[in-house]
Amino acid sequence: VSHHHSWSDRLRAAVAARGRLCVGIDPHPALLEAWDLPRSADGLEVFAELCVEAFVGEVAVVKPQVAFFESYGSAGYAVLERTVGVLRDAGTLVIADAKRGDIGTTMDAYAQAWLEPGSPLSSDAVTVSPYLGFDSLGAALDRAVAHDRGVFVLARTSNPEGSALQHASMSTGGSVAQSIVDAAAARNLVDADTVGLVVGATRDHGLDLSGYRGPVLAPGLGAQGATVNDLAEIFRDCRELLLPNSSRSVLAAGPSVTALRAAATQLRDEIEAGLA
């Protein structure tokens, strides 16, 4: 993996070559069971290896859900470290879905864990939560810029209970979610595409994305509402770097590597056709 290219360049090149689908690696206990794997770090390792074999070279971006590894403690983290390393060595971009959020030196330590070259968990990008204020993410954004990595900030999530908070009005006008979009847009004028947004693939996200230039990670495809055919309309302002994320609908095809790969490539092609 060349680290001399910016995150933006790497993302654009990967998407041009292998489409915009982002596949989740979510070793949910029920999935381990469905794949006939033990609910242990050993089962986790096999699950991750099957996913890697299925997705490398076929999809541009893979998003491991950190919680499902963390639940097995250090053994689970060891599996995650190996998985992230193998994916990145193979040229697949990795978004660590860790949703970290904190302030000052603590935020910086999280950023060091997920974005610093040489860190065991070093990924191409990490998801972060702006609940402590967008500016609390400063250390992570600075580290991302320094190392040509990306940060995806939660703006409007696809879970129904997010609405009350995310649609709440700011004293300055506009919704909380829109304020995150606007802050990300402003930051990207300085550091192109460093700040991505997480915006759920729902028809009613209610955001004005017309002023935002950068990647959008859009979870909730299929399982939580929006279909592939909805994407072009819902995200018309930011289709170029839209990364629709699907985990369940693809992983349901496992444990066969052939079936997993077929599910991913079919969805990838449907997404590309829908966004054309």
Provide a role label for each language-model segment.
Residues 2-65, 69-82, 86-95, 172, ...:
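Conserved N-terminal beta1-alpha1 strand-loop-helix module at the mouth
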Residues 15-16, 52-58, 82-89, 141-147, ...:
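Acidic (Asp/Glu)-rich catalytic clusters
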Residues 17, 59, 117-124, 145-151, ...:
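Glycine-enriched alpha-helix->loop->beta-strand junction motifs that scaffold or abut catalytic
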Residues 23, 62, 97, 126, ...:
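Conserved, mostly hydrophobic/aromatic
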Residues 27-31, 66-70, 100-102, 130-132, ...:
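Active-site-proximal loop/turn and secondary-structure-junction residues that shape catalytic pockets
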Residues 71-86, 103-108, 132-145, 202-210, ...:
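Active-site-adjacent beta->alpha loops and helix N-cap segments on the catalytic face
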Residues 197, 201-245, 249-250:
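A C-terminal functional module that forms or caps the active site or interfaces directly
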